[in-house]
Design a protein with these regions (language model features):
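Short, charged surface segments at domain edges that flank catalytic/cofactor-binding sites
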Residues: 2-12, 18, 25-72, 99-101
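Intrinsic-disorder/low-complexity peptide segments enriched for small residues
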Residues: 3-4, 21, 137, 144
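Intrinsic disorder/low-complexity signature
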Residues: 5, 29, 55, 87, ...
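Ordered hydrophobic segments in well-structured contexts
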Residues: 12-13, 108
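Short cysteine clusters
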Residues: 21, 73-76, 111-114
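Broad structural signal for hydrophobic residues in well-ordered alpha-helices, predominantly aliphatic
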Residues: 64-65, 76, 125, 139
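Histidine-centered nuclease catalytic patch
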Residues: 74-109
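Polybasic, low-complexity binding patches
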Residues: 95-109, 113-148
């Protein structure tokens, strides 16, 4: 089934009012990248391109992620009992891709050990690697179109 394209605020509001989360659910919904960035700025702060209060935006973003994703490590499937920003692991790092830092699709929920493995280890051997490669391609294509 093809994902549903959301092009304006009314469509976004329509699906969120019905319990869907199009910022995360990229398999069901595709959002116009400009709409996505606009909504992310409103939810988390005006720091998508390096402006604004980045630490406060990070706190809002990580809390939002924790509220909207299952509380288990995506690699080991172990439950994670309480909130910690350490569990929010960027697929593409904030330093190399600051424009994607507050895109919920760019986050895996990982326990501390798996977060370190993704950042510093042999990520190619991780269970989440193939899915993350697809997400990386999707993110780079969408955000690349913003620069045109």
């Amino acid at each position: 089934m093809e994902p549903i394209l959301l092009t304006d605020r009314e469509e976004y509001q329509f699906v969120t009012d019905r319990g869907f989360c199009p910022l995360l659910d990229y398999k069901r919904f595709t959002m116009d990248i400009r709409l996505r960035v606009e909504i992310q700025r409103e939810l988390f702060g005006h720091c998508v391109f390096g402006r604004g209060n980045i630490p406060q935006a990070n706190v809002r973003f990580f809390r939002w992620i924790w509220e909207h994703k299952p509380h288990q490590c995506e690699e080991t499937l172990r439950p994670l009992s309480s909130y910690s920003a350490v569990y929010c692991s960027h697929i593409l790092t904030r330093g190399s891709h600051p424009e994607m830092a507050h895109d919920p699709r760019n986050i895996n929920i990982l326990c501390f050990e798996m977060h370190n493995r993704w950042e510093n280890g042999d990520r190619e051997k991780m269970r989440i690697y193939p899915g993350n490669v697809r997400i990386i391609e999707l993110l780079k294509n969408e955000y690349g179109s913003l620069r045109i």
